[in-house]
């Protein structure tokens, strides 16, 4: 069977070059006679993989020396807890609620202290990003938390919020490495890797060194302290070795693509193809305010659940898979992450155009 165009929100499409390389090295990694899956995490071979992956990520994002790169098991939901556990010195966190993942992080933080929702777009089903130029930031807030790109609803922050000097924490899971970020503007940048970077099972946290301390909430487990990972180069326990290996290959692939500035240009071209069609279509409609549209996740609807279901079924038969919207919102969603080729988006638009012609 030939490969399909996979528009899944995560786990998601991977660069074919990376998959081929991993396949070639599956039984014998660079002459060592074993798979990376079989390696000791204390071996020189794996430690070289880890160091190279970190350095390539630092190069791609231009991460300053006063930030630690941490490879952490557990994914995004664990970061919802780790952020307040490690940062809530005053037991206060301010949250900008722009979707379900920010809302879940907000609810998790309420278990550890006072969490304020200082802005929200829930009034219009998270179809826009609220004005963040003059937020009611609490003077005692330990940080301001955002989800930079909203996977379910297809919005992204067009510019960073004014945090009035407070630490900015960002969940970048679904836009990780899709465009350059000014790292020094953040205290913590974290992302689950399963959307745009690698296989499921890990998050990467980029944490400013002064925020990594022993001063965490009482009762914080060893494995939920950023310091545990920072002090041990992410090797306190057995890390997700194969996941790190694949992420490292993705970092090299991104470098070979020209880096994050080049990737942003490519992603803008892909998104424009799809949004331009949605704006002219009489059948399909986008669901997000134009100025806040995501480059990564594009939700759309026909206005009829029956027609949506027909489209999803016929698209799958034509080789365009995982276009069904999130279970909480319905409709359709095309996730067009870094590894989705421009050809894939162009062919999807062609299919949508033909579907509209047949069903108008």
Model region roles, listed by residue range:
Residues 2-4, 317, 326, 330-360:
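PLP-dependent enzyme catalytic core of the Aspartate aminotransferase-like
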Residues 3-54:
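A glycine-/small-polar-enriched, mobile loop at the entrance of the PLP active site in fold-type I
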Residues 15, 193-275, 289, 358-360:
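Active-site C-terminal subdomain of aminotransferase-like
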Residues 32-79, 86, 100, 108:
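Conserved N-terminal alpha-helix of the aminotransferase class I/II PLP-enzyme fold
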Residues 88-103:
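Conserved PLP-anchoring active-site segment centered on the Schiff-base-forming lysine
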Residues 109, 121-176:
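Active-site phosphate-binding strand-loop segment of PLP-dependent enzymes
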Residues 169, 183-194, 203:
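Conserved active-site segment immediately N-terminal to the catalytic lysine
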Residues 284-315:
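Conserved PLP-binding catalytic core of the aspartate aminotransferase-like
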């Amino acid at each position: 069977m030939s490969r399909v165009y996979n528009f899944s929100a995560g786990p998601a499409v991977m660069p074919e070059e990376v998959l081929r390389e991993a396949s070639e090295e599956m039984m014998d990694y660079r002459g060592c006679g074993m798979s990376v899956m079989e390696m000791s995490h204390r071996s020189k071979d794996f430690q070289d993989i880890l160091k190279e992956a970190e350095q390539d990520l630092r190069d791609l994002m231009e991460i300053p020396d006063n930030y630690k790169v941490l490879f952490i098991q557990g994914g995004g939901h664990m970061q919802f807890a780790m952020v307040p556990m490690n940062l809530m010195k005053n037991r206060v966190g301010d949250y900008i609620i722009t979707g379900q993942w920010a809302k879940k992080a907000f609810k998790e933080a309420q278990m550890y202290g006072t969490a304020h929702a200082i802005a929200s777009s829930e009034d219009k089903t998270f179809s826009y990003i609220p004005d963040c130029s003059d937020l009611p930031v609490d003077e005692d807030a330990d940080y301001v938390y955002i989800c930079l790109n909203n996977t379910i609803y297809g919005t992204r922050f067009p510019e960073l919020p004014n945090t009035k000097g407070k630490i900015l924490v960002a969940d970048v899971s679904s836009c990780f490495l899709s465009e350059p970020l000014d790292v020094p503007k953040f205290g913590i940048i974290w992302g689950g890797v399963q959307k745009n970077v690698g296989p499921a099972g890990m998050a990467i946290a980029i944490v400013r060194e002064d925020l990594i301390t022993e001063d965490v909430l009482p009762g914080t487990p060893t494995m939920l302290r950023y310091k545990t990972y920072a002090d041990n180069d992410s090797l306190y326990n057995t890390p997700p070795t194969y996941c790190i290996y694949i992420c490292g290959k993705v970092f090299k692939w991104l470098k070979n693509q020209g880096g994050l500035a080049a990737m942003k240009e490519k992603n803008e071209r892909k998104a424009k193809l799809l949004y331009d069609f949605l704006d002219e279509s009489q059948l399909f409609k986008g669901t997000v305010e134009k100025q806040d549209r995501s480059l990564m996740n594009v939700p759309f609807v026909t206005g009829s659940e029956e027609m949506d279901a027909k489209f999803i079924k016929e698209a799958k038969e034509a080789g365009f898979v995982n276009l069904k919207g999130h279970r909480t919102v319905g409709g359709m969603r095309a996730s067009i992450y870094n590894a989705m080729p421009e050809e894939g988006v162009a062919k999807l638009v062609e299919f949508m155009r033909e579907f509209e012609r047949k069903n108008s």
